[in-house]
């Protein structure tokens, strides 16, 4: 019984891939699993003409600075309007 329990624990850990499982938004509705080395989620503003802008949602290792940007390190945290 102990062997079965140990096997289930090992299989669970392998399936979860604990070392690389951060999930971030890649658009307003789509999500992605971040590649190795990218340990933060980010939403940053890209300026257009006449003072308008749009947001880029992505995984990153280094976040952009800016008043409207979000940089965080927990799953699906880059959709909010505040950093976390």
From Swiss-Prot:
Belongs to the three-finger toxin family. Short-chain subfamily. Expressed by the venom gland. One of its GO terms (cellular component) is extracellular region. Postsynaptic neurotoxin that produces potent, and completely reversible, postsynaptic neuromuscular blockade, as well as broad spectrum inhibition of human muscle and neuronal nicotinic acetylcholine receptors (nAChRs). Inhibition is potent or moderate, depending on the receptor (alpha-1-beta-1-delta-epsilon/CHRNA1-CHRNB1-CHRND-CHRNE (IC(50)=2.56 uM), alpha-4-beta-2/CHRNA4-CHRNB2 (IC(50)=1.8 uM), alpha-7/CHRNA7 (IC(50)=7 uM), and alpha-3-beta-2/CHRNA3-CHRNB2 (IC(50)=12.6 uM)). Acts as a competitive antagonist of ACh. Zn(2+) binds at residue 50. GO terms for molecular function: acetylcholine receptor inhibitor activity; metal ion binding; toxin activity. InterPro entries: Snake_toxin-like_sf. Its main location: secreted. Gene3D superfamilies: CD59 (2.10.60.10). It comes from the Eukaryota. Keywords: Acetylcholine receptor inhibiting toxin, Disulfide bond, Metal-binding, Neurotoxin, Postsynaptic neurotoxin, Secreted, Signal, Toxin, Zinc. This is Fulditoxin. Residues 1-21 form the signal peptide. Homodimer; non-covalently linked. Is able to form a tetramer of dimers in the presence of 2 zinc ions. The record marks 58, 61, 64 as: Contributes to dimerization. Disulfide bonds join 24-41, 34-59, 63-71, 72-77.
């Amino acid at each position: 019984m102990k062997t079965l329990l140990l096997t289930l624990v090992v299989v669970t850990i392998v399936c979860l891939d604990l070392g690389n499982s951060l999930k971030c938004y890649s658009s307003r509705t789509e999500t992605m699993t971040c590649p190795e080395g990218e340990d933060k989620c980010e939403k940053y503003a890209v300026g257009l003409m006449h003072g308008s802008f749009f947001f880029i949602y992505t995984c990153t290792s280094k976040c952009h600075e800016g008043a409207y940007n979000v940089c965080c390190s927990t799953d699906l945290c880059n959709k909010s309007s505040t950093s976390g």
